[in-house]
């Protein structure tokens, strides 16, 4: 007996494997999760290949593929995934974003708080897919220093300037270090990172690393520091949680939607002194570190691969029914 052909799903992402950015890693992870039930194609722009459903990451940058797929289809099996720049910058500025949302059968957001940014007509067809990470064992960490890691390409949305300023505010006698991982996409920010590394041995700029090396760095750190100004729902948050690494993060919707409103590790976005205080507190107060760790551990079930896979399958079942 011949098995029925698997439905074909095209995942469109403006990211590329060589760029090693969040869009690409999301697309690659989702493709792997879906391949047991679907034939999955990943493209940077849809080339017209037959597909039964499309999942398009980035409403603005994938707008051409979205419009072409939706054309001449009364009810396309089309899901548009909203990134942080879509939600918190481009939605009110670029007509392509609302057009993409209107064309979609389903809208995907990557954390619960994002629903608040959608008009009622879009919220009705929105679904939340929390990004996951493979669990890693928690490793023993030194007690004689506080080693922090920040992961994010150097660009304004990730707000590395707040990191730089915070490190300058932390007293030099405190054994607090920061390793910064991310490609130098913004030349001015890259110059600042390299200058700080020369001036302050506690700060180390590693540039872009492979995903495996980045996860190892997160796993070995005491804290992930995540100062973004705009975030749709950063997968690095999930990677830290699933590695047993606590988090200090900016109080923005993209982080609150993953960690919860009562998470004890927030500082106000752009507040370097607030970040510095959090890091000093984490070094000096072992009970505070335990509170952070407990709060992160409580998020493991929500950020597990099983939950993400289930949400994706439910999404496609709705569109293809």
Protein language model features and the residues they cover:
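Glycosyltransferase donor-sugar binding loop
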Residues: 177-191, 207-208
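A short, active-site helix/loop in glycosyltransferases that binds the activated sugar's phosphate group
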Residues: 102-126, 133-136
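Conserved donor-binding/catalytic core segment of Leloir-type glycosyltransferases
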Residues: 140-158, 163-169, 178-181
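Conserved acidic donor-binding segment of nucleotide-sugar-dependent glycosyltransferases
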Residues: 261-272, 281-286
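Aromatic "clamp/platform" in nucleotide-sugar-dependent glycosyltransferases that forms part
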Residues: 229
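Nucleotide-activated donor-binding/catalytic signature segment of Leloir-type glycosyltransferases, i.e.
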Residues: 191-209
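Short hydrophobic beta-strand element within catalytic cores of glycosyltransferases
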Residues: 246-249
């Amino acid at each position: 007996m011949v098995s029925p052909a698997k439905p074909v799903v095209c995942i469109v992402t403006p990211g590329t494997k060589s760029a090693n950015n969040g869009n690409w890693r999301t697309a690659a992870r989702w493709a792997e999760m879906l391949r047991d039930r679907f034939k999955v194609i990943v493209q940077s722009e849809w080339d017209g290949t037959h597909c039964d459903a499309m999942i398009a990451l980035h409403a603005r940058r994938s707008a051409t593929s979205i419009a072409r797929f939706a054309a001449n289809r009364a009810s396309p099996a089309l899901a548009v995934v909203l990134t942080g720049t879509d939600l918190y910058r481009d939605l009110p500025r670029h007509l392509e974003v609302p057009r993409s949302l209107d064309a979609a059968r389903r809208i995907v957001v990557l954390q619960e708080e994002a629903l608040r940014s959608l008009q009622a007509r879009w919220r009705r067809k929105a679904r939340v897919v929390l990004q996951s990470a493979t669990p890693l064992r928690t490793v023993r960490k030194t007690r004689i220093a506080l080693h922090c890691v920040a992961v994010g390409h150097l660009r304004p949305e990730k707000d590395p300037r707040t990191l730089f300023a915070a490190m300058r505010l932390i007293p030099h006698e405190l054994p607090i270090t920061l390793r910064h991982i991310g490609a130098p996409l913004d030349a001015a920010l890259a110059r600042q990172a390299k200058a700080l590394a020369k001036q302050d041995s506690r700060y180390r700029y590693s540039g872009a690393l492979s995903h495996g090396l980045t996860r190892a760095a997160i796993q070995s750190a005491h804290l992930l520091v995540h100062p973004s100004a705009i975030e749709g729902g950063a997968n690095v948050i999930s990677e830290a949680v699933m590695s047993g690494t606590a988090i200090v993060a900016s109080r923005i919707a993209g982080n609150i939607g993953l960690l919860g409103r009562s998470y004890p590790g927030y500082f106000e976005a752009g507040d370097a002194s607030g970040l510095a205080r959090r890091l000093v507190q984490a070094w000096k107060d072992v009970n505070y570190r335990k509170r952070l760790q407990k709060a992160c551990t409580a998020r493991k079930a929500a950020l597990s691969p099983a939950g993400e896979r289930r949400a994706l399958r439910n999404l496609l079942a709705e569109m293809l029914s």
